Amino acid sequence: MASGAPDGKWKVVKKGKKSGERREGERKALTESNVTPGGTAPIKMANTVYEMGFDRIHKKQNKEQVPPNNMSSEQPQKQQQNPGKKKPQSGDSVCKQSKFHTLECALKALDVAELQRDLEKSQNMFPENPSIWVKDLAGYLNYKLQTVKNDVLIQQSHDYPYCLINKELKGIVRSLLAKAPHVLDVMVDHCIFSMLQELDKPTGESLHGYRICIQAVLLDKPKTVTSNLPKYLELLRSHLNRPMKCLTVMWAVGQAGFTDFTEGLKVWLGLMFPVLGVKNLTPYAILYLDRLLLAHSNLTKGFGMIGPKDFFPILDFAFMPNNSLTPSQQENLRNLYPKLKVLALGATPESTLHTYFPSFLSRATPSCPAEMRKELIHSLTDCLNKDSLSFSVWRQLYTKHLSQSSLLLQHLVETWDSNSRAMRKSVRETVHSFKVTNGEFSGKGSSSKDLEACDAACQALLHKMKSGGFPWWRLIVIAFVFLFGSVLYDVRTHNSFQESTSAQILQQSGLLSVSREAWNKVSNYSLQGQSWLERNVPQYYSQAVEVLGPVLEQVWAKTQEGGAYACEKGSVLLSYAKDNLPRLIEWLHSSIPDSVFQFIEYLRELLLHLHQTYLLPAVTYLEAAVQNSWQQYVKSCNGKVTWDCVRGQVGNISHSSWTYLQNTTMTFTNWALTIISRH
């Protein structure tokens, strides 16, 4: 504002207070804004450099003069003549801009160089207050990225809108966040509460800039929000009557889970699972869990995050009817239940399943839904099959859960043949214990239908144990042992194999003569091959040395020269790489997409898994097999490996192979002749 001086002279009047007073007020406001609020009180927002329009303020200072008296008297007349035109307020230093149709158009129109200049000004003016830098970044991006319609986040990918920005803008954002690592939580809170304030307005602005800043922080530092989840849960509960605000908080905090599976499970269990069942929030809570499990196919990183206290409420939500979930939501949660069960049981289910057995057993009542009863019985069977301690837990709970135990016993009767041998042994001991308990109850006269059902199931199990299938394998083993023992006794009785009855049978059948003929042929061929090698190998070796010796010497000399040259060049390259490798790494981090790093991480985990699971056991087994074979070979040669021993071993192997081949051929020939004779 301006007015004429009493003496009729022009007088320069500046807007507001003095610059020193204004800056002092700004620093005071900024200091107040940096204080982290306790509880759920909203963060007091300070004016950022961009919002104050410091650049325009400095340009306008010293240029405003007091107009003449007649000019000041004409202003009300002009305002009356043009009532539609409003006088711009002195505090509005930022001009309104037109909105873009899509976020892609807004990002293309964004002037990255201007953003860089504004951020540099902010850092120069407030070098010791990085919270102003990050707030300026959020305010600038949100002001510039205005669209006609706000996209529905539930219909977009989990990394939207951060996935749309280019590498240059990502580099600027990341470099600024790297300079302010201690105020990242302040930035996230600033963006969240700014979005909540915009939602209070009838025609609020788009929130793309705030969302991009939240994603940029939590993609690298997910623990920024997971370290204080109770605060966000209280904030969520305070806005339950405003679904859009709740979804905004859930979306913002949920961004921490897409780079770290453990932090994502913390977010879902600590923020979204408590509101599961709230009508307007349940769809996003289930969708977030689906996207989280889809983004992290390797569930091993989440082992230990879900315990019995969290798992069984999830089980009830997934299978119990008439709860606060709709049938479609319950079906979606039921599809995710198997992965949640794997996470709950952990890497060693054989040592943790007995802790889940009591809760499984108490829920497996005859009146529970069929699908839930099927899942509970299957889980109880897994507990008994994998964790032997579950049997002792079952024996302790038997008298308190007779109806549930009868269902489990009947299931064991139906699936008895498919149970493992170790489980059958434990079931036998448990059933005998149950029989004793049933007898005690019957003696006291406290019989019931559930007790009778349990007793009948125990009787059926005992009957199953006694009436097993025909032991074919035992019969085959016994027959083989009997045949081998008979031959051995026959040879021992007649003092030699040639005089034994077994040899006579083989002689009459023609097998003995055939095997002798085969052995003679193999021995003859082996002797011929040995004599050929003894005659020709020295001659061929001398010729090879005469022809290839000079060539091999030249190759060896060239190899030495090439090795020396490679070492010389390699040292130069190593020194060059040592000097330039940090720059290359920094350039790669700013240029390569994040998906490439994720793919490399997945590939590394796959190779590590293959190395530990398959390669190392295979190498160990191969080493043991080779060592065992060599020991057996040395033992067969009486501890000394000679050429005669090698020749004998080769002869034995050849004889055995030829005998087996001839026997197989004769068997096949006889079978073919039999088939032909039938026709």
From Swiss-Prot:
Glycans are attached at residues 70, 298, 322. The keyword Membrane applies. Residues 1-94 are annotated as: Disordered. Constitutively interacts with CASP4; required for the localization of procaspase 4 to the ER. PANTHER family: TRANSMEMBRANE PROTEIN 214. Belongs to the TMEM214 family. Critical mediator, in cooperation with CASP4, of endoplasmic reticulum-stress induced apoptosis. Required or the activation of CASP4 following endoplasmic reticulum stress. This is Transmembrane protein 214-B. It comes from Xenopus laevis (African clawed frog).
